[in-house]
Amino acid sequence: MNITVISVGKLKEKYLKQGIAEYDKRLSRYCKLNFIEVADEKAPENLSEAEEIMIKDKEGEAILKSIKDGMFVIALDLAGKMLSSEALSEKIDKLALQGNSHITFVIGGSLGLSQGVLKRADFKLCFSPMTFPHQLMKLILLEQVYRAFRISKNEPYHK
Protein backbone atom coordinates (compact mmCIF):
# COMPACT_ATOMS: atom_id res chain seq x y z
CA MET A 1 0.00 0.00 0.00
CA ASN A 2 1.24 3.47 -0.92
CA ILE A 3 0.04 6.45 1.08
CA THR A 4 0.75 10.01 0.00
CA VAL A 5 0.05 13.06 2.15
CA ILE A 6 -0.30 16.27 0.17
CA SER A 7 -0.27 19.36 2.34
CA VAL A 8 -0.08 23.10 1.85
CA GLY A 9 2.95 24.90 3.27
CA LYS A 10 6.37 23.90 4.53
CA LEU A 11 6.64 22.22 7.90
CA LYS A 12 8.78 24.48 10.09
CA GLU A 13 8.24 23.44 13.71
CA LYS A 14 10.89 21.03 14.98
CA TYR A 15 8.54 19.19 17.35
CA LEU A 16 6.11 18.45 14.51
CA LYS A 17 8.95 17.27 12.25
CA GLN A 18 10.07 14.88 15.01
CA GLY A 19 6.57 13.52 15.54
CA ILE A 20 6.02 13.04 11.81
CA ALA A 21 9.41 11.32 11.47
CA GLU A 22 8.43 8.94 14.29
CA TYR A 23 5.14 7.95 12.62
CA ASP A 24 6.88 7.71 9.24
CA LYS A 25 9.21 5.15 10.82
CA ARG A 26 6.36 3.26 12.52
CA LEU A 27 4.29 3.17 9.34
CA SER A 28 7.16 1.79 7.24
CA ARG A 29 6.17 -1.79 8.19
CA TYR A 30 2.66 -1.26 6.80
CA CYS A 31 2.98 1.08 3.82
CA LYS A 32 5.22 3.25 1.70
CA LEU A 33 4.66 6.83 2.83
CA ASN A 34 5.26 9.86 0.59
CA PHE A 35 4.95 13.54 1.44
CA ILE A 36 4.25 16.34 -1.01
CA GLU A 37 4.26 19.93 0.22
CA VAL A 38 2.85 22.59 -2.08
CA ALA A 39 3.50 26.30 -1.57
CA ASP A 40 1.07 28.23 0.55
CA GLU A 41 -0.14 31.58 -0.67
CA LYS A 42 0.12 34.68 1.49
CA ALA A 43 -3.25 35.30 3.13
CA PRO A 44 -3.46 38.74 4.75
CA GLU A 45 -6.05 39.44 7.45
CA ASN A 46 -9.55 40.56 6.46
CA LEU A 47 -9.72 38.86 3.07
CA SER A 48 -12.78 39.33 0.94
CA GLU A 49 -14.61 36.17 -0.10
CA ALA A 50 -13.30 36.59 -3.66
CA GLU A 51 -9.70 36.91 -2.41
CA GLU A 52 -10.12 33.83 -0.24
CA ILE A 53 -11.41 31.82 -3.22
CA MET A 54 -8.49 33.05 -5.37
CA ILE A 55 -5.94 31.90 -2.78
CA LYS A 56 -7.62 28.52 -2.31
CA ASP A 57 -7.82 28.06 -6.09
CA LYS A 58 -4.12 28.82 -6.53
CA GLU A 59 -3.17 26.33 -3.79
CA GLY A 60 -5.70 23.91 -5.25
CA GLU A 61 -4.07 24.01 -8.68
CA ALA A 62 -0.76 22.92 -7.14
CA ILE A 63 -2.51 20.16 -5.19
CA LEU A 64 -4.33 18.87 -8.28
CA LYS A 65 -1.05 18.76 -10.25
CA SER A 66 0.34 16.46 -7.53
CA ILE A 67 -2.55 13.99 -7.80
CA LYS A 68 -1.85 11.18 -10.25
CA ASP A 69 -4.28 8.86 -12.01
CA GLY A 70 -5.11 5.81 -9.92
CA MET A 71 -4.81 7.59 -6.58
CA PHE A 72 -7.80 7.29 -4.25
CA VAL A 73 -8.07 10.83 -2.86
CA ILE A 74 -9.28 11.52 0.67
CA ALA A 75 -9.68 15.25 1.36
CA LEU A 76 -9.64 16.43 4.96
CA ASP A 77 -12.57 18.81 5.16
CA LEU A 78 -14.79 20.15 7.94
CA ALA A 79 -17.85 19.17 5.87
CA GLY A 80 -16.56 15.60 5.43
CA LYS A 81 -17.70 12.44 7.15
CA MET A 82 -16.47 11.74 10.67
CA LEU A 83 -15.17 8.22 11.28
CA SER A 84 -14.05 6.39 14.38
CA SER A 85 -10.53 4.94 14.38
CA GLU A 86 -12.07 1.51 13.77
CA ALA A 87 -14.13 2.80 10.85
CA LEU A 88 -11.04 4.43 9.30
CA SER A 89 -9.24 1.10 9.63
CA GLU A 90 -12.14 -0.65 7.86
CA LYS A 91 -12.17 2.04 5.14
CA ILE A 92 -8.45 1.55 4.41
CA ASP A 93 -8.87 -2.26 4.41
CA LYS A 94 -11.86 -2.03 2.06
CA LEU A 95 -9.98 0.27 -0.31
CA ALA A 96 -7.09 -2.21 -0.45
CA LEU A 97 -9.50 -5.10 -1.16
CA GLN A 98 -11.07 -3.06 -3.97
CA GLY A 99 -7.66 -2.69 -5.60
CA ASN A 100 -6.85 0.82 -4.44
CA SER A 101 -3.15 0.48 -3.74
CA HIS A 102 -2.46 4.22 -3.53
CA ILE A 103 -4.37 6.38 -1.05
CA THR A 104 -3.72 10.12 -1.04
CA PHE A 105 -4.75 12.31 1.88
CA VAL A 106 -5.01 16.04 1.16
CA ILE A 107 -4.63 18.68 3.88
CA GLY A 108 -5.49 22.23 2.87
CA GLY A 109 -3.90 25.45 4.02
CA SER A 110 -5.22 27.88 6.61
CA LEU A 111 -8.23 28.71 4.40
CA GLY A 112 -9.11 25.11 3.56
CA LEU A 113 -9.36 23.37 0.19
CA SER A 114 -10.56 24.71 -3.15
CA GLN A 115 -13.78 23.48 -4.72
CA GLY A 116 -11.69 21.85 -7.46
CA VAL A 117 -9.82 19.70 -4.94
CA LEU A 118 -13.04 18.82 -3.10
CA LYS A 119 -14.64 17.77 -6.40
CA ARG A 120 -11.63 15.58 -7.25
CA ALA A 121 -11.76 13.88 -3.84
CA ASP A 122 -13.16 10.36 -3.77
CA PHE A 123 -13.99 10.73 -0.08
CA LYS A 124 -14.14 13.68 2.32
CA LEU A 125 -13.01 13.00 5.88
CA CYS A 126 -13.58 15.21 8.92
CA PHE A 127 -11.52 14.57 12.04
CA SER A 128 -13.46 16.96 14.27
CA PRO A 129 -15.75 19.98 14.08
CA MET A 130 -12.84 21.86 15.70
CA THR A 131 -10.24 23.58 13.55
CA PHE A 132 -6.60 22.48 13.86
CA PRO A 133 -3.47 24.12 12.48
CA HIS A 134 -2.88 22.42 9.12
CA GLN A 135 0.70 21.48 10.05
CA LEU A 136 -0.45 19.78 13.27
CA MET A 137 -3.13 18.00 11.25
CA LYS A 138 -0.42 16.12 9.34
CA LEU A 139 0.83 14.59 12.62
CA ILE A 140 -2.71 13.77 13.81
CA LEU A 141 -3.47 12.14 10.45
CA LEU A 142 -0.35 9.95 10.57
CA GLU A 143 -1.16 8.84 14.11
CA GLN A 144 -4.64 7.79 13.02
CA VAL A 145 -3.36 5.98 9.92
CA TYR A 146 -0.87 4.12 12.12
CA ARG A 147 -3.65 3.30 14.58
CA ALA A 148 -5.81 2.07 11.66
CA PHE A 149 -3.11 -0.36 10.51
CA ARG A 150 -2.61 -1.63 14.07
CA ILE A 151 -6.37 -2.20 14.43
CA SER A 152 -6.49 -3.97 11.07
CA LYS A 153 -3.69 -6.35 12.09
CA ASN A 154 -5.20 -6.94 15.55
CA GLU A 155 -2.03 -5.55 17.12
CA PRO A 156 -2.11 -3.81 20.51
CA TYR A 157 -2.03 -0.01 20.56
CA HIS A 158 -5.52 1.29 20.02
CA LYS A 159 -7.03 0.39 23.40
UniProtKB/Swiss-Prot annotation:
The keyword rRNA processing belongs to this UniProt entry's keyword annotation: yes
Compartments, as annotated in UniProt: Cytoplasm
Alphabetized InterPro entries for the sequence: Alpha/beta_knot_MTases (IPR029028), RlmH-like (IPR003742), tRNA_m1G_MTases_N (IPR029026)
CDD domains to which the protein is assigned, alphabetical: RlmH-like (cd18081)
Enzyme class of the recorded protein, top EC level: transferase
Origin: domain of life: Bacteria
Entry EC no(s): 2.1.1.177
GO cellular component entries: cytoplasm
Annotated binding of S-adenosyl-L-methionine, by residue: 76, 108, 127-132
GO molecular function: rRNA (pseudouridine-N3-)-methyltransferase activity
Keyword vocabulary terms for this entry: Cytoplasm, Methyltransferase, rRNA processing, S-adenosyl-L-methionine, Transferase
Keyword Protein transport: no
Catalytic reactions on record: pseudouridine(1915) in 23S rRNA + S-adenosyl-L-methionine = N(3)-methylpseudouridine(1915) in 23S rRNA + S-adenosyl-L-homocysteine + H(+)
Subunit: Homodimer.
Function as written in the Swiss-Prot or TrEMBL entry: Specifically methylates the pseudouridine at position 1915 (m3Psi1915) in 23S rRNA.
Family as reported in the entry's similarity comment: Belongs to the RNA methyltransferase RlmH family.
The protein's name: Ribosomal RNA large subunit methyltransferase H
Gene name, Swiss-Prot/TrEMBL: rlmH
